[in-house]
Amino acid sequence: MNQANACWGVYREQAHSPNRVDDDAAIMMRVGEAMAERGFSVNLVTSDAVLGAACVNVFAMCERGPILDCLGTMEKAGAVVVNASAAIRNTYRHRMTELFAQHHVSAPVSHIVATDANKPRLADRLWVKRYDFHATQSDDVIYAASESGWRDALRRFAARGIPFVVAQEHVEGDLVKFYGVRGAAAADDAKWFEWFYHRDKGMLGHRFDVARLRQAALAAAAALGLEIFGGDAVIQANGEAAVIDLNAWPSYALYRDRAAQTIADHLTERFERRSRLAPSTRS
């Protein structure tokens, strides 16, 4: 096995995988197996192993800021990291909110609000979410359908030392989940896309064009710079999809084997292209 093809896969931190630790680990292991089948020497590690590590190509599920800083240093030294450290950081909710607005992504109206602000409710129904990470516990997302509910949500976040929230206006419709893999260059370069209805939610049965959902999801991923992504969208009565959440590297639980092969093909292309472009180290 060619050690020049060495790469690391970095697991997501368990605190960032509520009720998904096994599923998140499973997709990483399956991608690692698929990369080994393609001739790579793969080392699957926890995020703490990245601290102070040498420069190596990486596929990463991790989310903590200090780990992303280390991955960013590797990138500056010439390593390929997928998803890029900046793209992973862009999934922090306050960044996502700003980037979705800048790139006109089809998404609910969202507001960044200080938890100590004496601010009246911004809409009749709101999803109040911590401003940085995706949910690590049930209280990281609170539904507020009244003024008292809104103020209680702010108090609860403030009591936990969380200084800001994203208040996302509720959108009525059918909840769907989607998974994708896209190229790093063009916004619409979809290598694979799949969707399904959320099994735990009631259905209104709104008709829609899957191509429009795909377009909205890819635009959202491109806005954040994600290549490997998944998320949630609401299909509205007019058939339009509103992206309500986007994650870097989901568990792909229903499509793990297919996703792993597509991801491995994508990683192989990314890692080998960088190897071809890198300047020779021979004297």
Go through each PLM region and give its residues.
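Conserved N-proximal alpha/beta basic substrate-recognition cap immediately N-terminal to
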Residues: W8-A114, H134
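A short glycine-rich, hydrophobically flanked beta-strand micro-motif that places a catalytic Asp/Glu
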Residues: L44-S47, V165-Q168, V176, L226-N238
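Rossmann-like NAD(P)H-binding beta-loop-alpha module
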Residues: P108-L126
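A short beta-strand motif that forms the metal-chelation/ATP-contact edge
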Residues: C55-A60, L126-K129, F178-G180, G239-L254
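ATP-grasp fold ATP-binding core
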Residues: F100, R121-D139, I162-E172
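C-terminal active-site "lid" helix and adjoining low-complexity regulatory extension at the edge
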Residues: V31-E33, F208, A222, L226, ...
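Phosphate-binding site of ATP-dependent enzymes
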Residues: I142-L224
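Flexible, charged surface loops at secondary-structure boundaries
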Residues: M1-N5, A49-V56, E75-K76, K119-A123, ...
